[in-house]
Every structure is written in structure tokens, then in C-alpha cells.
């Protein structure tokens, strides 16, 4: 993908007319005047739900993509999907893998260790009853084209493999530790040939992926992500997820080099000068929906500066969302208990 195309994607807000412009203004106003409710708070990981996935399908000669985070290197290898002669190795890419991983993190965090419609914490199993329902929960259109794209990206996501490497030196030795992480241990995908929207899936996450999504993910506002993903570029969204997660524990000014930023966010952008321009444009877009963000981009320096800022989602709103999730689990349990008391165990199980 050319730098010009990527840059246009960054600037593209997805507007096709007056109606979309009005919706966008209304969304910005809504973000400004109220905090997100429990349904609008999801959880993101700066790598696992964002930058690890390429913005577009890499060329056939690319074996893996990788991102570093301190001493850790995350590597993504494409999986094989399809049947018979249609089998092919492809990467999950674009916005849908990001939303799918964030949706999983939301379901896991909201379950709070209890079994729900979508999560069984004991077996670390995720259930998607239908693609239509999944699209609705992710705030996506219900049309057939969207449902087909989500289904395809879900299959690519579940087929890929992640590995995490840590290296170090000491006493004349080089040590490298590697953990191999297929996202799932087992998966069943049900395809409805007549209507893709009724397709679904059940899969068991690996312990490592489940734990990282449940413990290392940071809250974000889905109204913000909806705005940032309106265009074709995922860069504004990735920057937002990284920044709101970083601000949680930031107590002092933090310089971040342009080289580090390019490695993290510059996939498929060949010219660093173009990347800097696009990063600044994406950052300005993020600031529209994250007004408390304080990030400085000195004109003639080789770094940007993160100043301590509030997180995108206030702590109070997160606590309220967690309390609402606990109430929801309690209500499900009470309904099950009431059903047992009224109808007996056998009938309650079938409900």
C-alpha cells in the first residue's frame, strides 16, 4: 500500500454525506457531555488488541509480523484457513481482529470469574451464538457484507499463532525464552450456508491469552473507538489504545522516540517522514475524543513527550461498570436458582 493511500486513509473519516456528518457531530457531543456507561466500556491491550495485527493483508512473502514491548517481542504468524484446494495461509488484518479481541476482553472482564452466555471461565471457552449478534455487540452494521467480513476475520484470527520472546544477557551468556501461543486450544466454527449472519463459533482460549486479556487490558470508550475506526486507517485507534493504557500509571513526563513509534505504528509505511505526518494527523484526531490527553510533538526533536494525563475512561466509570457487571452475573444466577425452585433441575437446565 502506498504512503499516499495510507495517508488518505488516515484523513478519511468515512463520510459519504450530510447524514454521516451529523452523526459524527452528535457522537462527538455525546462523548463530551457524559461518561461512558457500562456497555460502552471495553478493554484493550496495546499489542494483543491493536498493533500486532497488520492494517492490511501483507504480501505472500511475509512469514510473520512482530512488535516489541520492552524486553518482550510479540510475533504473529498466519494460520491456514479454507478447505481442499481453497486452503491458504493468511493474516488477520484491519479493524475487525482488533474489535474481536477487545470484545473477548470485555466478555472475560465482565464475567468476573462466573459463567455467562458468552464465557465459561472454568474452561476458558468463548461462545459466539451468531455473527449477527456479535456485530450488534461490536456496534457494526448487520448487513451481509459486514457479517461475511467479520466471519472471515474471525476464522483468520482463530487460526493464527502468537509467540512471545524475551531475551537477556549475563555472565557471558545470551538467553532467549519463547512462549508459543495459539490463540485457541480448540475451535468449532459453524457456517450457515444460506445466511452467514447465523453462523457462529465456540472456542477455547489458551491460558496465556485468556490471562493477558483478563489482567493486562485497559478500559476504553467504545464511542471513541467507533469514531476513530470510521475511516480505513487503524492508526488513530491503535494510538488511542496505547495512550489511554499508558496514562494509567504515568507519573512523570515520558519522551518516546520517533524510531520506537515507527516500529510500533508504522506498518506498511515506507517513508518515515510520511509516517511522522500521518502520526501527527492521527494524534489530532485522537485528541478530539480524548480532550484530557496531553501529548507534545516538538517540531525539531526526534521524540514526542507524554505528559501525565487522565485516562480516557474515568476510574469512577470503570468501577460503576464493574459493579453493573457483578449485578448482571448475580441476576443471572438468581434467575437460574428461581427456575430450579419452580420447575425442578431438569427443566431449568434446558432453559
Question: Where would I find each of the regions flagged by the language model?
Answer:
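Charged, alpha-helix-forming regions
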Residues: 1-351
Amino acid at each position: 500500500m502506498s504512503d499516499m493511500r495510507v495517508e488518505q486513509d488516515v484523513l478519511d473519516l468515512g463520510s459519504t454525506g450530510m447524514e454521516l456528518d451529523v452523526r459524527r457531530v452528535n457522537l462527538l457531543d455525546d462523548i463530551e457531555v457524559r461518561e461512558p456507561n457500562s456497555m460502552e466500556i471495553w478493554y484493550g491491550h496495546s499489542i494483543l488488541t491493536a498493533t500486532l495485527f497488520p492494517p492490511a493483508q501483507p504480501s505472500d512473502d511475509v512469514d510473520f509480523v512482530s512488535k516489541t514491548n520492552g524486553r518482550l517481542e510479540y510475533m504473529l504468524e498466519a494460520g491456514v484457513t479454507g478447505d481442499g484446494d481453497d486452503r491458504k495461509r493468511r493474516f488477520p488484518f484491519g479493524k475487525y481482529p482488533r474489535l474481536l479481541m477487545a470484545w473477548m476482553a470485555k466478555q472475560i472482564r465482565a464475567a468476573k470469574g462466573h459463567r455467562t452466555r458468552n464465557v465459561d471461565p472454568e474452561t476458558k471457552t468463548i461462545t459466539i451464538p451468531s455473527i449477527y449478534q456479535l456485530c450488534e455487540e461490536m456496534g457494526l452494521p448487520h448487513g451481509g457484507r459486514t457479517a461475511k467480513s467479520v466471519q472471515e476475520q474471525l476464522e483468520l484470527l482463530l487460526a493464527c499463532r502468537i509467540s512471545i520472546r524475551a531475551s537477556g544477557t549475563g555472565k557471558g551468556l545470551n538467553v532467549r525464552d519463547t512462549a508459543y501461543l495459539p490463540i485457541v486450544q480448540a475451535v468449532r466454527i459453524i457456517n450457515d450456508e444460506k445466511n452467514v449472519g447465523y453462523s457462529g463459533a465456540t472456542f477455547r482460549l489458551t491460558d496465556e491469552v485468556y490471562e493477558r486479556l483478563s489482567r493486562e487490558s485497559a478500559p476504553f470508550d467504545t464511542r471513541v473507538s467507533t469514531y476513530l475506526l470510521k475511516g480505513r486507517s487503524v492508526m488513530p485507534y491503535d494510538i488511542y489504545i496505547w495512550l489511554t493504557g499508558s496514562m494509567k500509571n504515568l507519573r512523570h513526563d515520558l519522551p518516546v522516540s520517533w524510531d520506537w513509534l515507527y516500529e510500533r505504528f508504522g506498518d506498511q509505511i515506507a517513508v518515515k517522514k510520511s509516517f511522522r505526518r500521518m502520526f501527527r494527523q492521527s494524534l489530532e484526531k485522537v485528541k478530539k475524543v480524548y480532550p484530557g490527553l496531553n501529548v507534545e510533538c516538538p517540531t525539531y526533536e526526534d521524540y514526542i513527550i507524554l505528559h501525565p494525563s487522565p485516562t480516557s475512561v474515568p476510574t469512577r466509570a470503570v468501577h460503576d461498570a464493574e459493579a453493573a457487571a457483578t449485578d448482571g452475573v448475580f441476576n443471572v444466577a438468581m434467575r437460574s436458582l428461581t427456575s430450579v425452585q419452580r420447575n425442578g433441575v431438569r427443566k431449568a437446565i434446558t432453559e
